Every structure is written in structure tokens, then in C-alpha cells.
From Swiss-Prot:
Source organism, top-level taxon: Bacteria
Signal peptide location: 1-17
Protein name, as recorded: Efem/EfeO family lipoprotein
Protein's membrane topology: Lipid-anchor
Keywords of the record: Cell membrane, Lipoprotein, Membrane, Palmitate, Signal
Length: 284
């Protein structure tokens, strides 16, 4: 009986040991898989860091040209540069939270400043937009505002390498931005004087799509159907924007966009935002 008990105990220990080995193997596989995903997320974030650096570099170059046009009293050149230069900034807007107080200094609207009772502190591109498109003049105040804008653009450019960009910020920022496009920017509130809103929309969509493209390989391993759904909705939004391209590589005035198309665009962006918000699955 003692021998039988000993044999049974030995067998139990052997089975338990084998079970522990299998468990360790499974844990090892899971750990390696998690490490692989973390490495891919890190690589994608690094690539987006580089993308943001490039956009802010071009934004600074464009702002220098824009300010030079203001200094030369060249209204036509300043207006030609205005929407195109701003696109570099708008592409980076998913992570504008990382810009700190430089974001409102560069991109604040008068309505927002009034709401916060800070209209006397208003500065940036939209203040100059008002001078060019509504007041239709370049004076000493405009030139002073342009110099301050350039100073802020240089500061942001210098800060680019130290921005705290994370996968969470990228994902949440892209969803929040598209939600803003669909609910408030679609009214024309962003470029209220110049009506160059479609340039902003295109840049915002491109910025969000860049984030999707970088995370796409990871997402397709987790949820191929979700990835395909996001791509399909990006295609729909871009197709609607293409409808209002002009012959010079730019976009028509937002005033020319029909109410029907404004609604269609808002609906398309909302439809995109819904699956895009599920991309956080890649971090799980």
C-alpha cells in the first residue's frame, strides 16, 4: 500500500510539474507577444514624433514667408500663403495638447478668447486672418502681431523634440479632433473671416489618418475588420473633400459648400470617429 501511495504521489507531482511547464510556456508566449506589441507601439510613436517634427519644421518655414509678406505689405501673397501654411499646423493638431500654452497663442479664435474674457490677449494666425480678410489692411498692429506669431512658431519648433507624445495621446487626440470637426468646425467657425475651412479639414483628416496608418499593422493583427472599417470611412471623407478641390491644388471657399454637403461631411466624419475610437484595442 505504501508503494502504491508513493507511486501515486510521484505521478501526481510529475503531472503537476508538466502542467507548470505548460503554464510557463504559455506565460512566456504571452510575454513575448506583449513585448512585441510594445515594441511596435514604440516604433509607431517614434515615427509619429518624426512626422510631427517635419510638419512643425515646414510650419515654421511657411510662417517665416507669411510674416515676410506682411512686412512687405503684400496682401495677395499673405492671403495665398495663409491656408497652405496653416495646414502644417492642422496636421499636427491631434497632439496639440502637448503644445501647452503655445497652441492658443498660435491658433486661438476670437470667440474662444471672448468666452474666457481674454480678448485683449488674442494673438496668432486668426487675429492676422481678421486683419487680412475682414479689415482688409496691413498696419503696424498687424506687423507686430506677425512678429509675435513668428516668435511663437520658433518656440514651438524648438520644443518639438521634447514633446511628450504617447500612443494614448495620439489615439485620443485624433478622435477628439475629428469630433471637433464634425460638431463645431463644420459650421465654419474656425476660418470665420477667410472661409478657408476646407484646407483645415483636409489637414485634420490627414493628421488623423497618419496615426491610423502607423498603427494599422498592429490593429490588423488584433481586429482586421475594424481596420478595414476605418480605412473605408477615411476614403469616404476624402472623397467628399475632393469634390471641392479647385484647379490650383487648393480648395474652394467654404461658403460654396452646400448645406447638404456640410451635413454629409459631418455625418461621414462622425461615421469615421466611431470605429476610430475603438483603435485603443491595440494598447490592450
Amino acid at each position: 500500500m505504501k508503494k502504491l501511495t508513493t507511486l501515486l504521489l510521484a505521478s501526481t507531482l510529475l503531472i503537476a510539474a508538466c502542467g507548470n511547464d505548460d503554464s510557463k510556456k504559455d506565460d512566456s508566449k504571452t510575454s513575448k507577444k506583449d513585448d512585441g506589441v510594445k515594441a511596435e507601439l514604440k516604433q509607431a510613436t517614434k515615427a509619429y514624433d518624426k512626422y510631427t517634427d517635419e510638419q512643425l519644421n515646414e510650419f515654421l518655414k511657411g510662417t517665416e514667408k507669411f510674416v515676410k509678406a506682411i512686412e512687405n505689405n503684400d496682401m495677395a501673397q499673405a492671403k495665398a500663403l495663409y491656408p497652405k501654411v496653416r495646414m502644417y499646423y492642422e496636421r499636427s493638431e491631434p497632439v496639440a495638447e502637448a503644445f501647452g500654452d503655445l497652441d492658443p497663442k498660435i491658433d486661438a479664435r476670437l470667440a474662444d478668447m471672448k468666452e474666457e474674457k481674454k480678448e485683449k490677449e488674442w494673438s496668432g494666425y486668426h487675429k492676422i486672418e481678421k486683419a487680412l480678410y475682414e479689415d482688409k489692411k496691413i498696419d503696424d498692429v498687424t506687423k507686430k502681431d506677425a512678429q509675435q506669431l513668428l516668435k511663437n512658431a520658433k518656440e514651438l519648433h524648438a520644443k518639438a523634440d521634447t514633446l511628450d507624445i504617447t500612443p494614448k495621446l495620439m489615439l485620443q487626440g485624433s478622435v477628439d479632433l475629428l469630433n471637433e470637426v464634425a460638431t463645431s468646425k463644420i459650421t465654419g467657425e474656425e476660418e470665420i473671416y477667410s472661409h478657408t475651412d476646407l484646407y483645415d479639414f483636409k489637414a485634420n483628416v490627414e493628421g488623423a489618418q497618419k496615426i491610423y496608418d502607423l498603427f494599422k499593422p498592429i490593429l490588423e493583427k488584433k481586429d482586421k475588420k475594424l481596420s478595414d472599417d476605418i480605412q473605408m470611412n477615411f476614403d469616404k471623407v476624402n472623397k467628399l473633400l475632393d469634390k471641392y478641390k479647385d484647379n490650383n491644388g487648393g480648395y474652394e471657399s467654404f461658403e460654396k459648400v452646400s448645406k447638404k454637403d456640410r451635413k454629409a461631411f459631418a455625418d461621414a466624419v462622425n461615421a469615421l470617429g466611431e470605429p476610430l475610437s475603438k483603435m485603443a484595442v491595440i494598447t490592450e
